[in-house]
Amino acid sequence: WAGFGQPGIEGHWAFEEELYLGLCWRWRNIPKPTMVEVQGRVIAGGLMLVWPFDIIVASEDARFSDPVVAFGVNGVEYFGHPWEVGVRKAKEMLFTGEALTAEECKALGMVNHVVSREELKEFTMKMAKHIARQPMLGLKLAKQSVNQMQDAQGLWPSLQAAMSLQHMGH
């Protein structure tokens, strides 16, 4: 029914839609707060692994890029670029393939905190423990409220539309 196991584009599309877009969407909607710590380079598919998280803590040496326009596609399958860094910066990021620094991403709202690599784990764990002490229902409702605001702004249909265009580049 979903196209898995089908030959050609039908099977390929079903696989990528589920593996890339579907999993990222489900991670985004986990009813508990999620955090990720990032160091080094986050390239293309790496963005899809961090963008669904609620809080991103990056080391000072972290760099974020999506150079896949050079391969003839619009960007990674979970096309969160305009939502994560804004429209103009998303275009620059995609058109040039150049990396954004952790500090740039913090200024754009994509990264919550930038710390030294030595402090990364301790800082992230301290914040996670602080959040874990909050009432679970309040956390769930707060996360759901923010996610629903993005949904009302059209995040999901935008991701689906970009995914369709991404397949044209294959």
Q: Each predicted region: which residue ranges?
A:
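Glycine- (often His-adjacent) and acidic-residue-rich active-site loop
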Residues: 1-22
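CoA-thioester-processing core
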Residues: 22-29, 37, 43-94, 123, ...
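Terminal peptide-recognition signature
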Residues: 33, 50, 105, 142
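N-terminal glycine-rich phosphate-binding loop for ADP-containing cofactors
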Residues: 53, 155-169
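Well-ordered beta-strand positions
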Residues: 54-55, 92, 96-98, 104, ...
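C-terminal long alpha-helix characteristic of the crotonase
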Residues: 57-62, 111-160
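Short, structured loop/turn "capping" segments at alpha-beta junctions
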Residues: 87-91, 100-107, 135-139
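Short alpha-helical scaffolding segments that buttress acidic/His motifs in well-ordered protein cores
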Residues: 93-94, 142-145, 162, 166
